[in-house]
């Protein structure tokens, strides 16, 4: 492997933490205004959902999404694998199955060897193949210093089984299929302040596909779903609740966390994107007795996070068992994190 320099030293932010903040994004979309769409557009940007869905036939929809970001780890293959899993996750979050992917890359050819880019692409292809899909092309530009990589992900979904973020209802339980904390850990990686075992666990979490959780979600006919990425757990929950005209209570002690993340938050090893999320959440969140570091963890900008699912099925059902098994961590990790209310 050709790697003379740390990839994270070329990035201003880590992974999905470099996303435009939710408040800023809302402002831009408000300035843009609504647009007329064909009637076959079943899901678009209007509810801030994870992907668009276009009806192909009476029973089949095309799922389309795009994600890209700066390096969040130093190994180029891992970066490619994480970016691919992150892009495919939006298809899974809609209840779909990925079929095709396109590479989107920006590369500082005067700063980083092309062999590194090849490793990024190879890592991404590995994950796409694992998902049963294929990489069929892409587009690459040159950049001055900061590398960028991501993918367009395309899949199919049964139109009567689309999982939206706008259909949560009071009384539904909230499930989470992965632990949180990847934003804090990748920020620590960038700053050289985390150990190898914790970094490896975070990478393993981010490269784990949401395929099994998605299949369980679809089989259970859940009420609503989304994936947890750059706006953090509570940020994506806020988007779901606003789209569904609901509220929720979250048991913070039941949220599964990756190791060391609360300590990292206490030491202020926190990405700017997470701080923007936290500020945005102040408008609507009653934190109770949670300390500022505990609040930061719940706002932490995730990359390739888990599925956040609202379902009226109780924790004793197969949905809990099947999604619970997807969560990395010790046996018995608690994945029911709260409940939707009016």
Map each language-model feature to its residues.
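Active-site glycine-rich loop that binds ribose-phosphate moieties when present
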Residues: 152-161, 197-217, 290
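Glycine-/charge-enriched secondary-structure boundary and capping motifs
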Residues: 2-13, 24-27, 34, 39, ...
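Small-aliphatic-rich amphipathic alpha-helix that forms the alpha element of a beta-alpha
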Residues: 76-102, 119-130, 209-221, 233-239
